[in-house]
Amino acid sequence: NYDVVQLISPYFLHLRSERTLPAYHYLRRFNGKVFLGAFGTDYYYIRACMETDTYRYSDFKTGNCYRDTDFNKMTLQDWYYGGAAHATRTIAESCNGIMACLWEYYVAYQLLFPEKTAFVPLPINLHKIVSRIRTVPEILNFFIGIQNFKDTVKGTDVMLPVLQEVQRKHPDLCRITEVHDVPLSL
């Protein structure tokens, strides 16, 4: 009996997405409005990546070339062809509105749901950001955090060799700090 319920994604319960549909229908029946958050990779984002020229490059394609990675195959299986795709389509078609936090998610939904998709950017309080660099450093420090299971999706498989090449050419001018699979809870 709430006026507004916001779902963070079709995977709003820790169940397979298609198993959340009975809970979604319950929420629709007993609450005023239900809004879907477009906050990550889902059916409509993948659809925009695979079926349109909306993005010049994405997790799934660069130009017309599909990025054939194990992670992409797994993601496509559920979020583009499987139960998560069905749940996303069902919720997006019947919810009262869709809120996207990033431009790429906004345009993915805007293509099909222009009347109920809104861009609500992530808030960043610029007054709380203080620059720590007071002078030009003698050594440039690069930090690269790598999630091994997502390195090809996030591009760290490409960025790390480039950073290493820069360091080989200029060992006295740069340093690399490389970490792997650091939990988000730290």
Where are these regions (language model features)?
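Short N-terminal targeting/anchoring amphipathic segment
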Residues: 2-20, 32-37
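Short catalytic/ligand-binding loop motif for oxyanion handling, primarily in non-cytosolic enzymes
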Residues: 13-16, 42-47, 53, 106-110, ...
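A short helix->loop->beta-strand "cap" motif at the edges of active sites that frequently abuts
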Residues: 28-34, 95-96
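Acceptor-binding helix/loop patch of EC 2.4 sugar-transfer enzymes
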Residues: 36-81
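A short, active-site helix/loop in glycosyltransferases that binds the activated sugar's phosphate group
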Residues: 46, 75-117, 161
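Short hydrophobic "strand-cap" motifs at the C-terminus of beta-strands
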Residues: 101, 144-147, 178-179
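Conserved donor-binding/catalytic core segment of Leloir-type glycosyltransferases
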Residues: 120-124, 128-154, 160-163
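A conserved nucleotide-sugar
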Residues: 157-185
